[in-house]
A protein has these predicted regions:
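A conserved hydrophobic secondary-structure block that centers on an alpha-helix together
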Residues: 174-191
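Repetitive helical segments and hydrophobic/amphipathic motifs
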Residues: 11-12
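Hydrophobic faces of well-ordered beta-strands that scaffold small-molecule active sites
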Residues: 169-173
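C-terminal motif of bacterial Sec signal peptides marking the signal peptidase cleavage site
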Residues: 17-20
Length: 192
């Protein structure tokens, strides 16, 4: 009986140890990428793209949806930058609709190089999610509502491919246990 109890307790202890080791690797990956959700593939490079007043956004198609996404990106970065990025047919930050069955409808491929950033997707939804990842890669001061003068707007070089694992998205907001203002709920939804 004692031997059985000892063997059982050792098995439980070893299972806990191995489980802890595995989850620690996932946490290291999350800390390294600092992107939510963690993309399917991420490869970092030693280069960096720097946003300046001359930086432009390029749209390969004259789609109203892509123009809306470019306006959204400008709306997010304008307060901290103090200027808007011009939207043209070819630009330093290029949004391109392609035909890649591996990406699905909401997947994207984001490549940050020294001279250009490209976001490619099959549908505008994929471009939008690529822009969300790009916003997370900018320095944290980009969220400021006041112009930030002493910040270098550098984005680390990377090659990122991601698509949703499931066809739905969800997150729990428990408003019955804590009161949230309308603005907090809207911000929460935007973070999805």
């Amino acid at each position: 009986m004692k031997n059985t109890l000892l063997a059982l307790s050792m098995a439980v202890a070893l299972t806990g140890l191995f489980t802890q080791c595995q989850s620690s690797g996932n946490n290291q990956q999350a800390e390294q990428t600092a992107l939510i959700p963690i993309p399917q593939t991420v490869t970092y490079a030693e280069t960096a793209f720097k946003i300046s007043q001359g930086t432009t956004i390029g749209l390969e198609s004259s789609s109203a949806e892509l123009l809306s996404i470019a306006d959204y990106f400008n709306h997010k970065v304008n307060p901290a930058l103090g200027y808007s990025l011009e939207v043209k047919e070819q630009g330093d930050i290029q949004f391109s609709l392609i035909n890649n069955p591996d990406l699905g409808n909401e997947g994207y491929h984001l490549k940050v190089e020294k001279r250009q950033i490209s976001i490619e997707a099959n549908q505008p939804a994929g471009i939008f999610y690529g822009v969300q990842t790009l916003l997370q890669m900018l320095p944290k001061e980009i969220r400021s509502q006041q112009v930030q003068h002493d910040v270098e707007w550098a984005i680390a070089g990377a090659d990122i491919t991601d698509k949703p694992q499931f066809p739905w998205r969800g997150l729990m907001l428990d408003v019955s246990r804590h009161w949230f203002t309308k603005e907090e709920v809207i911000r929460f939804i935007d973070e999805l």
